[in-house]
Amino acid sequence: MTPAYTDKYLREHTPTLKDLIFTRREFLERTGMGFGAMSLASILGMSVGGTAEADTGALKASGPLAPKAPPLPAKAKAVIHIFAEGGPSHVDTWDPKPELAKYDGQTLPGLDGLAFPSPFKYAKKGKSGVEVCEVFPKLGEVIDEMTVIRSLWTDIPAHEVAQRFMNTGSLQIPKPSMGSWVVYGLGTQNQNMPGFITLGGKPEWRQASFLPGIYQGCNVNYAPGMKLDEILLNISNPFTGLDRQRRQLSFVRELDKMHAEKLQKDEQLETRIESFEMAFKMQTEATDAFDISKEPQQMRDLYGATDMGAKLLIARRLVERGVRFVQVQHGGWDTHGNVQTAIPRQAGAVDGPAAALIKDLKQRGLLDSTLIIWGGEFGRTVVRDRNGNAAPGRDHNGRAMVAWMAGGGVKGGTTYGATDEFGARAAENKVHIHDLHATILALLGFDHKKLTYRYNGRDFRFTDNFGNVVKDVIA
């Protein structure tokens, strides 16, 4: 039965001493045992010799990462967030504005600067007839699975602040990231993997802040050609095997029983221990998840032998294994100049892999339960950037931006909202960043105003009580 919103429900999302029964500073300081070997048997659910249930990260786990049913009907169970860092130009990607061409090089009414129409053409694609830019030919093939939001806007068009806002829902420092909130609310389906994994990006985008540290994103620095031990540093313990580590766990369990009554909570130490525990658990599964050489050649070809191709293939493998939230960073969208060459380069890097991800998830029956989100921190101006570049570009614009979503319960083959005739600002059915965040949480089964965490005497929320669900994009 889906739990109602009650104090008990919220308390069950907060780790208790029973969940984190592992504070033993003296033991850690005096023992020579490696940290990676000291994962709590109680959290792993392991017997001394290990069990099939433990090895598969079964759903009968307890503790802060145990899976929890959302309080409301959910469309999506997992999220893949493709973050286009730098601020993609909406008019050069997903928001056609033919009126701009009539004013090329002229001053636009009500705007300061010379009009800069997109050099790229749009054409209707799919059964839905949504207009898609020529720089996204592969995504045009799957447009009937996608919802394009053309009326998104943000508060401050400065990179650091806007990136923080998109990823944490706050203009202030520090606040928990989107992935941390999601895993805090839902737990994760695989206890042998982190619930929140990032492939690139800044630490601030994956921070847990005042949430318990177990909800922080685990970053993986991946690059094509990397070996597994380079992708996942220190994933294995070179000094001992898993069997011996399990025996050590049994020994640690006995120490836990002896010292449980003396337990004193130490948040910083608990966070470090939880990280070491996860490192042990990942030995059994993470190496497999990140090894894309195990994929058929046909599948690797579908995604492409590129950085983004490999990262999105890994994202699918992670979601397939029960990881709740995966963020893939894709930088380079800060096009103050050279739009003519920069946009095709950037779009080309993500077009094929993102289309492959949609097709692959659909073929596996995972698209309906996996929400894919693409977008950056703001949009760009529709006038030329005054930076003196011979090849024109665009400046930052927080009043107009674009994002698309696919799978996870969104309506396919649709657009929502619109900018004005030139694309300078969101005008019709405006969607603020808080609205986008509220909609994401709704698709996952949460009322964004009721998913709270109490800290320093007040209840905090991802949206800080702002925002409205965009119901028209939900199927």
Question: What spans do the regions from the language model cover?
Answer:
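Ligand-binding pockets and gating/stacking loops
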Residues: 1-475
